[in-house]
Amino acid sequence: LSSAASDVYKRQRTLVFNQAGKIQFGERSGEMTDRVQAVADYLDECGIANEPCGDILYKQWNKLMVNDGLNQAAAAFDQPYGGLRQPGEAQDMMRAAMQEVIRLANLEGVPLPPDNDVRFIDAMMPTFNPEGMPSMRQDVLAKRPTEVEEFAGVVRQRAKKYGMPTPANDFFYTRIREIEAGYDQ
C-alpha cells in the first residue's frame, strides 16, 4: 500500500491541498488477484482515487525516495514545498537523500532510474501548493515525534548491509533528532 502525488497538509482543523493523490496497492508478486480487484472496487465505490499496481515494490521504493528527501528536507531546513523548489542547500540535500534511496533500491533489486529524483522534482513539485508542507515539517512545527526512524533510520540500516555510505541520510537523522530533542527546551 502506498499513496502517490499528494500534497495534503493540515491547517488547524482543515485539510489543504492542490493534489489529493491516490492510493496505490497490489500483491508483492505483481499478480492482479481477486483480492486486489476487490479492494479497487471498494475504493471506487467510496469515491477514493486508487491505482491497482503490478509493480507495488517499485511504487513503495519510489514513495520512500520522495518521503526520504522531501519530508526530511522540509523538516530539517524548515521549508514549505515552495522553499524546496528553490536551488540551495535544502534542495541539494533533498536530492542527495533521494539519490541514496535510488542506489539502495537498485541494490535491493528494484530498478529505480538514476534520474528518478529529477523526474519527481520536475513533474510533481510544481503542482504542489508552495505554502504547503509535508507531514514531517508539520510534526516539527507541532513538536511531535517525526518519522525520521522510518526514513533515514531505515535507509541507513539497510544500506549498511551493502557497505553503502549514506551521508545525506546521516545528516537528516542527526539534524532531525536534534530538533526533536529541543522540543522540551
Description of each model-found segment:
Residues 45, 93-185:
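NAD(P)-dependent Rossmann-like dehydrogenase/reductase catalytic/cofactor-binding core
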